[in-house]
């Protein structure tokens, strides 16, 4: 192999390594964003469940009050 071909090969290998490193960084960033999104999702699900319970409690109280009004 000539020196020129080896230089081209070396250059392509360096570019490939740099691309791989950049992609690895991007993957790490995406993993972090995914984790943050998952945490936000979990928090919203918990809040939703709490609101459902609160909503049901209010409905029960309202039914009770309406029942008392009907009895009057």
Swiss-Prot record:
It comes from the Bacteria. Keywords: Cell cycle, Cell division, Coiled coil, Cytoplasm, Septation. Pfam families: ZapB (PF06005). Disulfide bonds: none annotated. HAMAP family: ZapB. Non-essential, abundant cell division factor that is required for proper Z-ring formation. It is recruited early to the divisome by direct interaction with FtsZ, stimulating Z-ring assembly and thereby promoting cell division earlier in the cell cycle. Its recruitment to the Z-ring requires functional FtsA or ZipA. Belongs to the ZapB family. Homodimer. The ends of the coiled-coil dimer bind to each other, forming polymers. Interacts with FtsZ. This is Cell division protein ZapB. It comes from Actinobacillus succinogenes (strain ATCC 55618 / DSM 22257 / CCUG 43843 / 130Z). The lineage of its organism: Bacteria, Pseudomonadati, Pseudomonadota, Gammaproteobacteria, Pasteurellales. The gene is zapB.
